[in-house]
Each structure stands twice: as C-alpha cells, then as structure tokens.
C-alpha cells in the first residue's frame, strides 16, 4: 500500500485546527484525523480590534510538532485562513504595526469615498469583487491615512495565510485565491491593479505577483530535521471549501456555512455586468482558473455572538427548543452592516425587530429562531439572484463546512429555497486544502478527480424541500406580494 500524509492548517475566525490526512493511493481513500484544535477570536489592542497572530503561530507549530512526535513522515503542509486581513513586515521580516482584524471600525466611510472618487462601476470592472466595507483596499487606505508614521518602515504586506507560510519557511508568497478577496487584483491580468493600489495608498513593491494554487513555497524543518514542503494551497478557506464541495454538474450551487455563509457557483468566466454589480456579486479566484461567483452572507457570526453573550453551552438543546417555535415571527437582514460587530448582538437584533414593528425576540430560542429563519430567507433571495444572473435555475445546493451540521437550518434552507440540499463534508476547507496538496504531489489529476474521492469518502446527508412548511408558505406569500406590486407598477 502507498500512503501520503498531508497536514492541513485550517484557521477560521473563531477556531483553528491542525488536521492530518492519510491518502491511500490504491483504493483512493482519504481519512482525516484532528491533531490539534484551538480557539481564535478578536482582541482589543491599542484601540484596534486585532488578531493574536503570535498565539496562532504557536498553536500551528504545536500541532505540527505533535504529528512529528508520532513518528509520522509528513509529505506536505498547506495553510488556509479567512480573507482580506494582512500583516505588514519591514525589510528584516519583522512586523510593523498591529495585525488589525476586518471587524475593526477603522474603514468606516472609506468604501463610499472610493466609489465617489474612482467610480463604483470602474472598481467593479477592474476587480470583479463584491463591495464590502472591510475589503483590504479600504483597510490599506485606513492604514495610510490614519497611521502615516508606519509607511516608511513597511517593506512587505502578506495576507494572513501567506504570513504563516512565511513564518514556517522564510519564503514569501502571495497566493491568488486569497489575493482576489482584497479587491486589489485586476480580474483580467490576475495581477495587482495599479489604479486600485494607488487609491489604497499602498506601494506596489509591498506585494509580489499572485501565484495560483499548487506551487511549493518553501520548506519547514521539522524537529527531526526533515525538510517538509509547504504548498500554496487555495489559501482562502472558502476557495478550499469549494474544491471539496462534491458539485455534480452545472446546476449545482454551494453554500460554505460557518462564521460567514458564502453562496455561489463555479464558472469558467466572471460575471461583471450591470446585473452582477447591482446584486453585489463577487468573482473570487478559484483553483484551476475557475471563478467562485458568489455572495457573502453574514452567516453564523450572529449566532456565535448570541451564544457568547447569553453564555449558552448546549447548542443541540438550543436548536431543539428553537425548532419547537413557529417560523418567521422575527425577521432581520443578517447582511445589515449593523451586525458586523455591534457592542451587543442580542440588543442589536432586538432593536432591528423593534424598528420594523415586529415582535421582539426575548428568549435564547427566539433569538436563534430569528437568526435561522432570517438566514434561510436570505439564502433563498441570494440563490434566486444567482440563478437570474446566469440564466439557469439550480437543481441542488451543497452546504459544506461546520454550519452544515445544523439540521434545522439545512431543512429551513431546503424549504425556503425549494431545492434539494446535500449537507457535507463538514471539514470542507481542510479537505480542499489537502486536495491541492495531493495534486501537487501528483497523486490526483485535478479538482474533479478529487471531488470523486470526496463523494465516496465523506458523510453526506440529503434534505428534501417541504412545500407545506411554514417558511415555504412565507416565501410563497412574499413572491406573490412582489408579483402583485410589479403588475401594479
């Protein structure tokens, strides 16, 4: 038997994990084992919301060392994380300033300023990326305007996964899929857009040309002295998750469900027309030159904050209590900027309901019901937008990532969207990370080849839409009201 041992470092906004994958060539089987799991979260430092990258690096090294201590020969390592955030370095490779998180308020008002000065359509035509107030372009503008004293010291700007790869190897890399989240990469050249960079205030010399997934960045020297290749995987965690989504045919959509929910479809060409701009659709880079045409949805961040504020530890019990409540009594827009990082999420949700003359969710279960129903309805709206954009309906939706373990939300999504939902794999980002490593090691041919492996090894659960559910009736009522308004217009 021929085995490959690959390690995936998968960092999310709320947690990180070091996972060991064992691939058996002859039977094309893939097994995952969690080596080390650790918490991640936001910190307040010198007036900014930041990431503790030193603690994260220590946790990564601890996980890698644990694998080596077991006597396992690692064939390769890959790192994926969230997008848009970065670390600044000087000529000696030392950090400059703080690793500020995207939920910090320093970018307030800058997106509108960019649209006014550069033109919203021109920015979109250049980047193809959705307008979000925390995109890297606005973070860099905030940095250069608010902390000009740092500029003379900056030699390099590395996105988060590239920074950790640099810390392991001493080699710098700017991986393409994550680079596209910055709104600074030109969609036609796959290189940094000089006009957008100029507006951000950043120096182009801070960046190297983006590289597509599949190259070896450098080597990590393990405690036993072995040189282990560190591969540039699809380092944006959603890009990795999409690679591991067992999409079957052109009518399949995906939803990567976690702190963020990202819903979209794969395409060989980007969509940057006026319809896409009006819908605020993003065209993020994917593996093998594919585009991830998708939309960002605030996701389970709202629930995570409620769990924290209410000190709820038993999520299954909460979901069971939530399921017993009637649907669609409390509806909010999860994508409202007010929910990006409020002082108190529970109070913010209640205020949104109060301002729209709805009942106020008071109990833990009512708050969760509000979040689940609102997300499912937003999923239905976004799926409809995506279908209109490409001119073809979807036949199934693949929900991947940690959020796919929420059976209630999966069923609500199926009912609201009126579409078959296939949930799994849970560790999609980790699997996609491993997939690129196996391709780099010449064990697999391409993404489609890897998806066949995922389909036969992952635990998948199907949810069939129930047209008689409360949320399905609510959606039908909304559509009927919209059609009436359109006819009367």
Swiss-Prot record:
Q: Which Gene3D superfamilies match?
A: 3.30.420.40
What name is this protein filed under? Rhamnulokinase
Tell me the organism.
Answer: Escherichia coli O6:K15:H31 (strain 536 / UPEC)
Q: Which family does it belong to?
A: Belongs to the rhamnulokinase family.
The UniProt subunit note reads as follows:
Monomer.
| CDD domains the record matches | ASKHA_NBD_FGGY_RhaB-like
NCBIfam families from the entry? Answer: PRK10640.1, rhamnulo_kin
Spell out the catalytic residues: 237
Paired cysteines (S-S): 68-222, 353-370, 413-417
Q: Which InterPro entries match?
A: ATPase_NBD, FGGY_C, FGGY_N, Rhamnulokinase
Q: What job does the chain carry out?
A: Involved in the catabolism of L-rhamnose (6-deoxy-L-mannose). Catalyzes the transfer of the gamma-phosphate group from ATP to the 1-hydroxyl group of L-rhamnulose to yield L-rhamnulose 1-phosphate.
Q: Select a single GO molecular function from the record's annotations and give it.
A: ATP binding
Per the record, the GO terms for biological process are:
glycerol metabolic process; rhamnose catabolic process
Q: Where on this chain does ATP bind?
A: 13-17, 259, 304, 402
